[in-house]
């Protein structure tokens, strides 16, 4: 029979500093409670990320035994303390060395690889009213992060030394057709001359009892869109053209696209612009069809599903097509050549930058760069499309993006650590591949704990300018939009050749409250650390400088925001 020596050690991940557990040891032959301590609760202390005395967590309890002398009891208790102390120290050091993770054991390097979340699958805009609050910064830094700055600066310098804005190789039309045979068979090469939006009539072979949206993937995979399509079903047959026993439906693509960027005010721009009577948007604000749904990506974390056919995308514009059809029918009787003024828009904030699906569907090129980009296909069908881009200081965009999409443990400290992790991952890619290859690298983008790549505006814009002219773009800054909404909206109206609004309509559009406001719990977290801001400004600096050169506007360098 052995005596109970209670040497209890336990690590707790929570923030409590002690916890009680029942002792189950003691001088017994079976699993009954220890007669010495009588199952009493023992106090266990937490070992956290601060400096710690490992032996302080050991509690040795020995009580008298008639067969042992005092000296023997003292030696055995001391020996147990020493053995358990060495065991705990070994386990802690092994955990630190093997994982390098910051798991409240020891303060680890900020450059570690952990479990990285996948990128979110839903993009959204940023509220202009949140812009000004980002300029305030706390007066002090986390001291440990300041000490880490020299090593982080080496990473940033390494990235900057490898930045080259090279010209991409453009695919020819036949290559595009081979990749999307069905899409090219559905969308014609010419559109109706009397519609500002690219529209055409196609034959509908169903009957008046046929459900045209029965197999639409947007309906099947999202309950919130079903009411919209229920309304479209009820009026569908009445909006067909009936000629010599045949039925024709009007199909349309967008006249303009709001292509980006996420957390840059696209939602607010969309909400104001749709108040104009000549503008009609898709049934869903962000279909993400060009970048995701046509590849079968519903949520990135769920992998690939069945691809959404182009017909499902075109269904989203049926409500606008119905109104255009009515206008065309009315005009044909009076003035056949009269142009229909209604224009269709689409506002997926992923269109400009997200090409993550290419590795799953296109043959890999020898240099790691995607052979096809989203804009190649849009240009193939709509070479005259108009493109609107809303941008903001990429440093503040990244923090807003982090606050919006992070689900738990959000803080300035957590953001700083994720930024440093992302920078190291990006540098590792740049050591072996080109800038473009890294920006469009799906594995890297899913590994980075913050979406560092979304703020590399110059890379994306230069690639879009390989197929579209600069005159087809309207590029806005969220900072300007937040300070003067009326001026921004007038620029948009002029760019889209929209008619003037009445005073009442304009007041409603410009004085409406900002959309997509920041959540109160995110506001309470405050701004990022000044040292984090400094790191990000140095990283994004070369890209902002190039963007300002391309646009011939120093405001896009964000040197004084």
From Swiss-Prot:
PTM (free text): Glycosylated.
Superkingdom, taxonomy of origin: Eukaryota
GO cellular component labels: Golgi membrane
Residue ranges, Lumenal side: 102-561
Principal cellular location given in the protein's record: Golgi
UniProt catalytic activity: dermatan 4'-sulfate + n 3'-phosphoadenylyl sulfate = dermatan 4',6'-bissulfate + n adenosine 3',5'-bisphosphate + n H(+); chondroitin 4'-sulfate + n 3'-phosphoadenylyl sulfate = chondroitin 4',6'-bissulfate + n adenosine 3',5'-bisphosphate + n H(+)
Protein name in UniProt: Carbohydrate sulfotransferase 15
Source lineage: Eukaryota, Metazoa, Chordata, Craniata, Vertebrata
């Amino acid at each position: 029979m052995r005596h109970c020596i209670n040497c209890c050690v336990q690590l707790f991940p929570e923030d409590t500093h002690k916890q009680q557990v029942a002792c189950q040891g003691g001088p017994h032959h079976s699993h009954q409670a220890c007669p010495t301590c009588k199952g009493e609760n023992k106090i266990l202390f937490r070992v956290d990320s601060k400096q710690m005395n490992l032996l302080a967590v050991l509690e040795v309890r020995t009580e008298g035994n008639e067969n042992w002398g005092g000296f023997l009891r003292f030696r055995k208790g001391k020996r147990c303390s020493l053995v358990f102390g060495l065991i705990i120290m070994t386990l802690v050091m092994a955990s630190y060395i093997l994982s390098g993770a910051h798991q409240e054991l020891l303060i680890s390097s900020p450059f570690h690889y952990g479990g990285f979340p996948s990128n979110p699958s839903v993009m959204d805009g940023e509220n202009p009213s949140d812009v000004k609050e980002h300029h305030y910064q706390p007066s002090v830094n986390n001291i440990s992060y300041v000490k880490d700055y020299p090593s982080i600066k080496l990473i940033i310098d390494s990235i900057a030394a490898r930045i080259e804005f090279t010209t991409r190789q453009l695919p020819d039309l036949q290559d595009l057709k081979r990749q999307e045979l069905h899409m090219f068979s559905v969308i014609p090469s010419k559109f109706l001359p009397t519609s500002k939006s690219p529209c055409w009539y196609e034959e509908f072979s169903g009957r008046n009892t046929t459900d045209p949206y029965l197999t639409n993937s947007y309906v099947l995979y999202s309950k919130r869109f079903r009411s919209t399509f229920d309304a479209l079903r009820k009026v569908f047959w009445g909006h067909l053209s009936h000629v010599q026993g045949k039925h024709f439906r009007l199909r349309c693509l967008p006249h303009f696209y709001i292509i980006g960027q996420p957390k840059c005010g696209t939602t607010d721009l969309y909400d104001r612009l749709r108040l104009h009577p000549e503008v009609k948007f898709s049934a869903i604000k962000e279909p993400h069809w060009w970048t995701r749904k046509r590849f079968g990506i519903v949520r990135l974390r769920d992998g690939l599903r069945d691809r959404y056919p182009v017909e499902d995308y075109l269904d989203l514009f049926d409500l606008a097509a119905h109104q255009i059809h009515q206008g065309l029918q009315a005009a044909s009787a009076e003035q056949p050549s009269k142009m229909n003024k209604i224009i269709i828009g689409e506002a997926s904030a992923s269109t400009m930058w997200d090409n993550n699906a290419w590795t799953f569907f296109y043959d890999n090129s020898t240099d790691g760069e995607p052979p096809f980009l989203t804009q190649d296909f849009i240009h193939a069908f709509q070479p005259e499309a108009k493109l609107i881009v809303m941008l903001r200081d990429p440093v503040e965009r990244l923090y807003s993006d982090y606050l919006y999409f992070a689900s738990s443990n959000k803080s300035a400290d957590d953001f700083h650590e994720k930024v440093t992790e992302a920078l190291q991952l990006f540098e590792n890619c740049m050591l072996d591949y080109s800038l473009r290859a890294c920006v469009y690298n799906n594995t890297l983008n899913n590994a980075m704990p913050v979406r560092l790549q979304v703020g590399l505006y110059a890379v994306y814009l230069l690639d879009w300018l390989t197929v579209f002219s600069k005159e087809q773009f309207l590029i806005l800054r969220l900072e300007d939009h937040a300070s003067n909404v009326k001026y921004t909206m007038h620029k948009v109206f002029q760019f889209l050749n929209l008619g003037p609004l009445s005073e009442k309509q304009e007041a409603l559009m410009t004085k409406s409250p900002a959309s997509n406001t920041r959540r109160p719990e995110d506001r309470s977290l405050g701004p990022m650390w000044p040292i984090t801001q400094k790191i990000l400004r140095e990283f994004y600096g070369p890209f902002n400088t190039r963007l300002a050169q391309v646009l011939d506007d120093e405001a896009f360098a964000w040197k004084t925001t």
